[in-house]
Amino acid sequence: MNDWLHFTAEEKIAAVQLYTTIKDNIADSLAPGDEQLIRRHVLQAIASHQLQRDIFGLNPILMALQTANLASAEIGLKRDGVFAILLYSNILCGFETVDQISDSFGDSVAAILRGLCRIHDLYKKNPVIESENFRNLLLTFAEDMRVILIMIADRVNLMRQIRDTTHEEAKREVSEEASYLYAPLAHKLGLYKLKSELEDLSLKYLEHDAYYMIKEHLNATKRSRDAYIERFIAPIAQKLTEAGLKFHMKGRTKSIHSIWQKMKKQKCDFEGIYDLFAIRIILDSPLDKEKMQCWQTFSIVTDMYQPNPKRLRDWISVPKSNGYECLHITVLGPKNKWVEVQIRTERMDEIAEHGLAAHWRYKGVKSEGGLDNWLASIRAALEAGDDLQVMDQFKMDLAEDEVYVFTPKGDLLKFPQ
């Protein structure tokens, strides 16, 4: 049971620490006996000697623990999603079957594992993912929303771990897939921090010189950028305080990937990008005064600095389908520089930063259940126009009126049903 021969000394320490953290993350969703049961299954898998390191030399148990920690802490998955992550290796190596998992842990965990296995089979059949058809088929196969969330968490974790690998071709394939497939999925689900991390790491691995060129420029201009931000926000802070508003402000440097995209789109060098940062005003507002105080802040900012009305984005009156709420406006600041200002409340900020995890916290949800209304709106966004009205909890039958088939050459084609 305690055979740790697959583990280095550092991995042993990391595994114990991760397991403890995960247990704390999902403690409020565990039933009596759950913790002992999952620990026994994981230890049995280790002792079976059926698990092997992957192409990058990464330990599958440690990877599962890292992914489970990310999924629980940064996305908000609870008992069923986390257990599926920890048990997935057992299924792949044939140590256990999905039916056996169902008997031990319940139908919900088994359903997630079936979804993960279906997508694993899809990858084996057609590993080429550079098509919109593949993305749609992937979503169609994932009938449980948590499958997609786990795949995003798994890819973020993998991208974090392969930094020093010598398998450059495999690293490139993983990075291209992260950029093309998983970053857009994370974006649609409101997981903006994970989306930015996937994009930045992909750029770092695929366009090494461009990534470090931008990073060095950002480091070199940090002092002047910070001084400008202080000059910009000082009069706003004074007016907001005089208005009796509770708030804090911060400057946020835009991601390296987004700066690189602007440079390519505008066909200019780093010095030609004017909006390297955004100012975020975060209000401590009671729920019933959120909209009023956001618009009051908007009025104060635009009275002080000339706005560009074409750059107004109002996601407070009509939030994005993934739950994002914020006012965006671009104004002309000191030295005739355009500055993007984002206005939102503490609640809106946490949702913008943490996506699903924040929604679940604000709803006081202790398990993955009870989120069908919000997840239904996410699903509607992913469906991109389908007329389905009835949405089962966590279901994502995204192409009910379409059929996907493989050609003899392995290409994916989409047809009306």
Label each region the model flagged.
Residues 37-40, 100, 112, 173, ...:
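Short, solvent-exposed alpha-helical surface patches in well-structured domains
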